[in-house]
């Protein structure tokens, strides 16, 4: 069994004065016209499960206009077990409680992880490599309590290294010290992200085959030392990308050595550009369909299939690693998917995690699905401020 959300309470959160949605089942469909606060409910759930918001707002913006504080609460159940997640937003700060005891965002994440799917995610395949790294990192911080530390320690070393490079320094004891720190923390972050991507992709292939059996999906995790130039990244055939060493064969020391070696090789280029050109902030994750780079050659439908499969595989991987089903948050994606992809998505959610879906149109769902769903129609009279 896994924790399930049974009710949501919002007070002075975004545009909501007071909202309570309870008696929630395994599938919750939130339906209503645009700009009535559907996405705000999804954001609140993410804030109370992942400890973050995909909107990345200043926290003051989540508080209703003219109010000093905002408040959101989830009630969760697992059999006879009851859990309450609460966040209080005040100014640019937020504080969490679980069953009345103060918790950090990282401590909150272990109770009920979430997987979020928004229309912006559908651009993930052709977006910049930083977006794909962010997507994997967002999953990783929920799977490992140590991952945020890995990332922050690397970012600190990277900032210091960049400051020295901007000052024209690429040698000497001070630079060598931060270069070593950059390699040590970079190796840890790279290996953790690479291993997660490897496990995620192994699940993606099975799901993809069920949706597009006539196509072969491949992927490459391309660490920074394998990305020799932008020209190489433009190549569309998978055979033109050297197969990196299998992740299970790489050690931290191997990656450290590669990063330090690349640092020496790129010293002139880094001094010219004033930034670090090596490290996990430059790693790439590329997908291929029938051997061709999906970013360059796949149709929009094929690219969206990859993203859909990545999200569904994330749900399965969370369940495998944490032993609990995450809550799946789908914000207005049904309108962006064709009938085949909607069918694949609804077939998945019928037998998997608790799911919250926002939509403007119930016609995207079969009568059978709606018969088993909790349908919440918004706006609900008296719950929102009339600005």
Stretches found by the model and what they are:
Residues 38:
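Conserved lysine of the Walker
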Residues 102-111, 118-184, 223-225, 385:
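A conserved P-loop NTPase coupling/switch region
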Residues 49-131, 135-147, 202-206, 262-264, ...:
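Nucleotide-state sensing region of NTPase/ATPase domains
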Residues 331-333:
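Walker B catalytic acidic pair
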Residues 1-33, 173-184, 188-327, 336-340, ...:
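Conserved NTPase motor "head" modules and their coupling/switch loops across ABC/AAA+ ATPases, GTPases
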